[in-house]
A protein has these predicted regions:
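Flexible, membrane-associating and regulatory peripheral segments of lipid-active enzymes
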Residues: 24-254, 278-281, 325-333, 405-412, ...
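Compositionally biased, intrinsically disordered low-complexity segments
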Residues: 4, 17-20, 31
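Serine-dependent carboxylesterase/thioesterase catalytic core
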Residues: 26-39, 207-401
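Bacterial N-terminal signal peptides that target proteins for export
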Residues: 2-13
Length: 482
């Protein structure tokens, strides 16, 4: 009995000590953050999972492209931590959208959390990651030094935004990116090795930033190898917070949330990247624009290219790329989708996770249709595979990556798709040839294996050399170097 009471006393003593320690901790005040500094804790990006969507800032030399290019990092925070109430405004593009797409856009004003650009990395593709640097980084101190290991491309050039300007500073990020890209294009031409394309890519659901960058290196590297050097892209890879948890079970419940995020990404910063940076700069410099997405990444890229950005620049914010990095007309974010067809030369949807009816204009559960069936791009190419078990699980819509969708579309001449197939080596056969604005490819012979550390059957079998052959064949046919 004495031992029992002794044990109880020890337990109570331990509990008392623990409570006292917790009380003491509660009294400890955190060090004040100097004005102008934005920390992860302030804006809700401090958990181990959330840090994985800006991991390049911690490992700029290790988590990097194996060729020159840019990584644009988009994250998501509670809106009250990054922008004042009512700061999110829409451009005239909003009025041009279908009711379903307007509903998607409205989430940018109503969701508890908001997507924003947190960083842009410039990778040089050198040994040991030499020279990789931060072009834009919200996590900087008042002296312009990153709070993480990534260093500024130009010493002292990083000036993080005030916390409540984190969202609106996305326009500054895009202006900085455009100026850097313009310098790269001009420099490459002077060196006698001009770029042929601006190439933008977005990966899909449940993809951490480090994995997305590895995937970029695989896909783009294989396409460059397939071209024997004829394909020289100025690359931009955009990463986004596409994962909820390390638990596969928990992630199942994130499907609807993340497909909405993909739509919002296309209607916001990805759309703005195309409209304000990639398309006008490429037109000015004589380059082709190729945009590629996989799964929910294809959902985001199609929204950006086919519907366009609905975000308007805050009043007084200079237009991007006029008179230098910034300048020209004030405010508003005017303009639609680059004046109709021709904005993007080639949009490729690899195993897309969105409804084909967004393109065909037929009934969809969400009422979301692209204006004029995605007439804003010169050429649209979709792939489908019978071996993809991820897109076939959607019961409320015919996703573009599903072979059953391909069969329905290609049996109906009214859809205006030119249909064909890819062989196991990435060769394609389509009729008619380059004149078709829309092409649909049965890639079942090519997209056939379960990729390493992935699910959904062959949904992610896009990282092999043969897929690079397919991409180069599509680029050569629909968006050849000028």
């Amino acid at each position: 009995m004495r031992e029992r009471y002794g044990s109880m006393l020890l337990s109570l003593s331990a509990l008392t000590i623990t409570m006292l320690l917790l009380a003491a901790c509660a009294q400890v005040k955190l060090a004040a953050v100097p004005p102008g500094e934005v920390t992860e804790a302030q804006i809700g990006t401090a958990t181990a999972l959330e840090k994985r969507f800006h991991s390049v800032l911690y490992y700029p030399n290790e988590i990097a492209l194996n060729f020159p290019g840019y990584i644009v990092g988009v994250e998501k925070s509670p809106r009250e931590t990054i922008t004042p109430e009512g700061q999110v405004a829409f451009s005239p593009v909003y009025a041009e959208l279908s009711a379903g797409l307007r509903h998607d856009a409205d989430r940018l004003k109503t969701n508890r959390k908001l997507l924003f650009i947190s960083h842009i990395m410039k990778d040089y593709g050198r040994e040991y990651g030499a020279g990789n640097c931060a072009l834009y980084d919200i996590y900087t101190d008042v002296n312009g030094k990153s709070l993480m290991p990534a260093q500024a491309c130009i010493e002292g050039s990083l000036r993080g935004p005030p916390q409540m300007a984190v969202f609106s500073y996305g326009w500054k990020a895009l202006a900085t990116l455009r100026a850097a890209m313009e310098h790269d294009i001009d420099d490459a031409s002077k060196r006698g090795a001009p770029y042929t394309h601006v190439f933008i890519m977005v990966m899909g659901w449940n993809t951490y930033q480090s994995e997305a960058i590895r995937n970029f290196s695989s896909i783009v590297g294989n396409a460059v190898l397939a071209s024997n050097g004829a394909f020289r892209p100025l690359f931009i890879g955009l990463t986004w917070p596409s994962r909820w948890s390390d638990s596969a079970l928990i992630n199942l419940f994130s499907f609807c949330d993340k497909k909405n995020d993909a739509d919002e990404l296309g209607l916001s910063w990805l759309g703005a990247l195309l409209k304000e940076v990639a398309v006008p700069l490429s037109r000015a410099k004589g380059l082709r624009v190729v945009v590629t997405g996989h799964s929910f990444g294809a959902r985001a890229t199609s929204m950006a290219a086919c519907a366009g950005a609905v975000l308007a620049r805050p009043a007084g914010t200079p237009a991007i790329g006029q008179g230098g990095a910034q300048g020209g007309a004030q405010g508003g974010g005017q303009g639609g989708n680059q004046g109709g067809r021709g904005g993007v030369d080639l949009l490729i949807g690899l195993q897309g996770a969105y409804a084909i009816n967004r393109i065909t204009g037929r009934w969809t559960p969400d009422g979301a249709y692209f204006p004029k069936g995605c007439d804003a791009v010169q050429h649209l190419v979709l792939t489908a595979s019978k071996n993809d078990k991820a897109v076939s699980s959607e019961i409320f819509a015919d996703y573009t990556g599903e072979l059953g969708t391909y069969d329905k579309i290609c049996a109906d001449n009214s859809t205006r798709f030119s249909c064909g197939a890819a062989d196991a080596k990435g060769n394609i056969g389509l009729n008619p040839l380059p004149q078709a604005a829309r092409a649909y490819i049965d890639a079942s012979q090519l997209i056939t294996y379960n990729a390493f550390d992935s699910g959904g059957g062959a949904h992610s079998d896009i990282y092999r050399r043969e897929t690079g052959e397919l991409l180069w064949n599509l680029i050569l046919r629909y968006a050849p170097p000028r």
